Design a protein with these regions (language model features):
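Short beta-strand edge/turn micro-motifs at domain boundaries
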Residues: 75-104, 169
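Residue-identity detector for glutamine
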Residues: 11, 27-28, 82, 86, ...
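Surface-exposed, charged secondary-structure patches
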Residues: 21-79, 138-169
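Short, structured motif recognition centered on aromatic/hydrophobic residues
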Residues: 70, 83, 92, 114-117
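Core segments of small alpha/beta cavity-forming domains
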Residues: 1-25, 105-140
């Protein structure tokens, strides 16, 4: 998928045209001549992945998958844009783009919580576990992992960059 997003020529070759584009349940089609290269997540400094449960992390490297979706989740406008890929003859092909409200997402409550958490430091302070389990790499040896706990005031010194308005999945 990364190569698809990064390479304009490959992207056109690996998109099924006319491409089905469904917005709020209404289907349209994008012709190849109207396609604009979409970098997906490749221009971002990081990307996020949401899992329902820890075991779902194993799917990320599962070679037997035939379908996969990449999502842009727009936290501030409550929209999701899904890029649906299907493996055809061993090649990943973009088959559909679908855009709809996050209100239809099974994890809408989490998205609402996360948006408030990322954008409101008072809300963060109220919702950080006390103490917070913290796992990081050892600055003196990047192959070693440190496990400790943080107090709420330490959270603000060690917290990662949080997506404020949009995230990938």
């Amino acid at each position: 998928i990364y190569n698809y997003a990064a390479n304009e020529k490959l992207q056109k070759a690996r998109t099924v045209f006319p491409l089905s584009y469904i917005k709020d349940g209404e289907q349209q089609f994008i012709e190849e001549k109207n396609w604009e290269h979409d970098h997906l997540f490749t221009k971002e400094n990081y990307y996020t992945l949401l899992y329902d449960k820890e075991e779902d992390m194993d799917f990320e490297k599962n070679p037997s998958l035939d379908t996969v979706s990449v999502e842009w989740i727009y936290l501030d406008t409550h929209e999701i844009r899904q890029y649906h890929f299907q493996r055809k003859n061993g090649l990943w092909m973009l088959t559909t783009i679908e855009q709809h409200s996050t209100l239809e997402a099974p994890y809408e409550d989490f998205l609402e919580f996360f948006y408030k958490f990322a954008n409101d430091s008072i809300f963060q302070r109220e919702h950080v576990a006390r103490p917070l389990k913290f796992v990081t790499s050892d600055p003196d040896d990047e192959f070693q992992i440190l496990e400790t706990t943080l107090e709420v005031d330490q959270w603000f010194a060690f917290k990662p960059l949080l997506p404020l308005h949009k995230m990938t999945n």
